[in-house]
């Protein structure tokens, strides 16, 4: 009975995902990331459109930044997706 109760508590905590925050890359290195502050629910990656499509900026955002004629911005909502 105790095992069942403990299992239910663990499953409840995992399902509720208490205190979940988004994690986004914030450098060009793929293994470095930061936890986004409250209210910033998107990860973004800005890359040069020409010639090499090199990432110029990554981070967290409340809204997706706009692309320009030189920079393409891609936004996503899952951990480390940028």
Curated annotation (Swiss-Prot):
Signal peptide (residue range): 1-21
Taxonomy, superkingdom: Eukaryota
Subcellular locations according to the entry: Secreted
Disulfide bonding pattern of the chain: 24-43, 36-60, 64-75, 76-81
One GO molecular-function entry: toxin activity
Keywords, sorted A to Z: Cardiotoxin, Disulfide bond, Secreted, Signal, Toxin
Ranges in a coiled coil: none
A GO-annotated cellular component: extracellular region
Tissues with expression: Expressed by the venom gland.
UniProt xrefs under InterPro entries: Cytotoxin_Cobra, Snake_3FTx, Snake_toxin-like_sf, Snake_toxin_con_site, Toxin_cobra-type
SUPFAM superfamilies: Snake toxin-like (SSF57302)
Residues spanning the membrane: none
Transmembrane helix as UniProt keyword: no
Family of this protein: Belongs to the three-finger toxin family. Short-chain subfamily. Orphan group XV sub-subfamily.
Protein name: Cytotoxin 7
